[in-house]
A protein has these predicted regions:
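N-terminal auxiliary segments of SAM/dcSAM-dependent transferases
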Residues: 1-74
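SAM-dependent Rossmann-like transferase core, predominantly class I methyltransferases
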Residues: 51-121
Length: 121
């Protein structure tokens, strides 16, 4: 099956299951399945996937459609320009926390020594 077809099929499954960003999630999961970046997916829509990659993608789509977060499926999440390993034993960094950091950095000078504790917000 071609990249464009499997990507659309995956996005349709996620959309039917009320996943908020179905196409983006499908792209991320496909990228993880074939171990190629998003650019490769966009530039090679007619590339035929190997069965092993298709099977991995389908398994990830099945888990995602049940509501499992993408970060847990791919075991990584970017936060504050860094990539972190994620699994079910840790909380997923949220964009709201990045916003808080940005606001704090606007208020305090770079020379200010801060100590911050974020307890499961």
């Amino acid at each position: 099956m071609k990249i464009e077809n499997i990507l659309n099929k995956g996005a349709d499954i996620l959309k039917a299951n009320k996943i908020v960003n179905p196409f983006l999630d499908a792209e991320i999961l496909l990228s993880e399945s074939i171990k190629k970046n998003k650019k490769h997916i966009i530039l090679n829509p007619t590339e035929v996937l190997k069965r092993q990659h298709l099977n991995k993608f389908n398994k990830l789509i099945e888990r995602r459609k049940k509501g499992e977060p993408v970060a847990y499926l791919i075991n990584k999440k970017e936060f504050w320009k860094n990539e972190f390993y994620i699994n079910k034993d840790v909380l997923i960094p949220r964009p709201d926390s990045e916003l808080i950091i940005e606001q704090v950095l606007k208020i305090y000078s770079k020379d200010t020594q801060l100590q911050v504790l974020d307890v499961g917000t």
